[in-house]
Regions:
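Hydrophobic, aromatic-enriched interface-forming segments
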Residues: 120-165
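Short loop/turn segments that connect beta-strands within beta-propeller blades
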Residues: 47-51, 91-95, 152-156, 208-212
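Conserved beta-strand positions in repeat-built beta-propeller and related beta-rich domains
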Residues: 27, 34-39, 71, 79-83, ...
Length: 219
């Protein structure tokens, strides 16, 4: 697999609090993007050149946000909060939190609880995306170990979990396995696959929901 850089746009805007952009999601008609910054209690809407639309961005009573995804008809946003390892549903019309679902409150959490120390470390949930074919939600745990976790559409049940490990192709020539991180997720409906990005590895990987690696490329 080969990736080609088409354009690059700066989106960091410290004046607006967008200091550490984390996660990116495209709206249904492809006209705008949403992102979060883990040190700012806000949802930011951007145009396709990375410029923040102040009137369409809004504050929210949550911090430590690390990933974001639009769901359904663009009426709600799903964001992950790393510190609590929760999925938060935000109503885009009212700009308010609709619900908050910690992984620890979901059915089958006992099968992955040993991967999440208490109190939480800084290696929790980092990315989120929605499978638009069945509305299942995927979240990714950053590292130690990296986990790909599939949730049902109601965010009440953990359906499956896969450890992202060397035997599945998740390796980097310059990083030990325990140092490789997983920073973001995106679902590709055209091929029914997931894209996983690694910050430390500087790579983007294409995988199935069962964490079978198709291909990987440096970015």
């Amino acid at each position: 697999m080969r990736l080609e850089l088409l354009h690059r746009h700066r989106i960091r805007d410290s004046g607006l609090g967008l200091n550490e952009p984390s996660g990116l999601t495209l709206n249904a008609d492809g006209s705008a993007l949403y992102t979060v910054s883990d040190d700012t209690k806000a949802i930011f809407r951007l145009d396709l050149k990375g410029r923040v639309s102040v009137s369409d961005s809004f504050f929210i009573s949550l911090d430590d946000l690390e990933g974001i995804a639009l769901r359904g008809d663009d009426s709600e946003l799903l964001v992950v909060q790393e510190g609590s390892n929760s999925v938060v549903v935000v109503d885009l019309n009212t700009r308010r939190e609709r619900s908050r679902r910690p992984l620890s409150a979901m059915t089958n959490y006992d099968t992955i609880a040993h991967h999440f120390p208490d109190p939480p470390d800084n290696n929790g949930l980092e990315g989120i995306t929605v499978n638009t074919r069945n509305n299942h939600v995927f979240v990714v745990k950053e590292c130690q170990p990296g986990l790909l976790i599939e949730l049902d559409s109601t965010l009440t049940t953990i359906l499956s979990t896969r450890v992202l490990q060397p035997s599945q192709g998740f390796i980097h020539p310059e990083l030990k396995a325990e140092k490789l991180d997983f920073s973001g997720l995106s679902y590709d409906s055209s091929s029914d696959t997931l894209w996983i990005v690694s910050d430390r590895g500087g790579a983007c990987s294409s995988t199935t929901g069962q964490a079978t690696l198709f291909s990987s490329a440096s970015i």
